[in-house]
């Protein structure tokens, strides 16, 4: 009888240890693979009582792949596409006069992100990234049906920059998280080459929310042993 009781206790203990081991493995445990999709859309319209109307739309798309090198520390690579278009109407009648602008930038780089868990659901995050960007921009002057490219305001640009961002992570499920950066401190150096000139223009920006659009909403999936089991 004692042997049966001892054997039963050993079995229960084994299952309890295994269950505890599974429970202690979280989304940010060492060895997990992280797939992140960042997406942002911003729209603006300024419409005073008179003719002038200004509208703009910006779309930001940034996927990344990372690896948890140790618990709560993620290292990875990212890739991003930013697109922006705007229309600045000066006169609507009798003949419309406006300026149309669009720009596309592609960026890629490396990043590291540290998690500071508050509980099983929430965590503070701090991330640092460094990367390169390249893109083009174009502006057209429109008068009625006549479109004239503005070569003085069109061209190509390349840059390098880095940032430290601060945010929050919400993990409703062990293998999925919603994350948002709420503040960032960055620096960016950019060289613009305008179509009507062989000279480049160097621009350096530094301050809050400069590099990589610190405000963002990320959808994050974690892949690792036992994360997707019920």
Residue spans for each PLM region:
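Short glycine/proline- and aromatic-enriched beta-strand/turn motifs that initiate or cap beta-hairpins
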Residues: 20-78, 88, 214-230
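Hydrophobic core residues within well-ordered beta-strands of beta-rich domains
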Residues: 33, 59, 73, 106-108, ...
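Short coil turns and loop connectors of transmembrane beta-barrels in diderm outer membranes
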Residues: 3, 29-31, 71, 118-122, ...
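Predominantly the C-terminal beta-signal and adjacent terminal strand-loop region
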Residues: 84, 88, 169-230
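Residues on the lipid-exposed face of transmembrane beta-strands in outer-membrane beta-barrel proteins
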Residues: 37-41, 63-67, 81, 108-114, ...
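Flexible, solvent-exposed loop segments that connect beta-strands
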Residues: 41-55, 80-106, 132-158, 189-208
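Bacterial Sec-dependent N-terminal signal peptides
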Residues: 1-24, 219
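Helix-adjacent hinge/juxtasegments
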Residues: 99-107, 112-121
């Amino acid at each position: 009888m004692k042997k049966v009781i001892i054997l039963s206790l050993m079995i229960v203990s084994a299952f309890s240890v295994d269950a505890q081991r599974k429970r202690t493995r979280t989304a940010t445990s060492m060895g997990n693979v992280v797939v992140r999709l960042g997406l942002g859309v911003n729209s603006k319209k300024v419409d005073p009582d008179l003719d002038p109307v200004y509208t703009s739309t910006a779309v930001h798309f940034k996927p990344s792949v990372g690896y948890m090198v140790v618990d709560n520390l993620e290292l990875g690579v990212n890739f991003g596409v930013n697109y922006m278009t705007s229309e600045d109407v000066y006169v609507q009648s009798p003949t419309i006069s406006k300026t149309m602008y669009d720009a596309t930038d592609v960026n890629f780089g490396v990043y590291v992100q540290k998690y500071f868990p508050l509980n099983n659901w929430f965590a503070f995050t701090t991330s640092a990234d460094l990367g390169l960007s390249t893109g083009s921009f174009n502006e057209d002057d429109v008068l009625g049906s006549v479109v004239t490219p503005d070569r003085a305001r069109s061209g190509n640009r390349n840059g390098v920059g880095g940032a430290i961002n601060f945010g929050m992570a919400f993990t409703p499920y062990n293998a999925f998280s919603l994350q948002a950066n709420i503040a960032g401190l960055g620096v960016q150096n950019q060289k613009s080459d305008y179509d009507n000139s062989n000279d480049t223009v160097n621009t350096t920006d530094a301050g809050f929310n400069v590099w990589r659009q610190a405000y963002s909403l990320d959808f994050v999936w974690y892949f690792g042993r036992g994360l997707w089991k019920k």
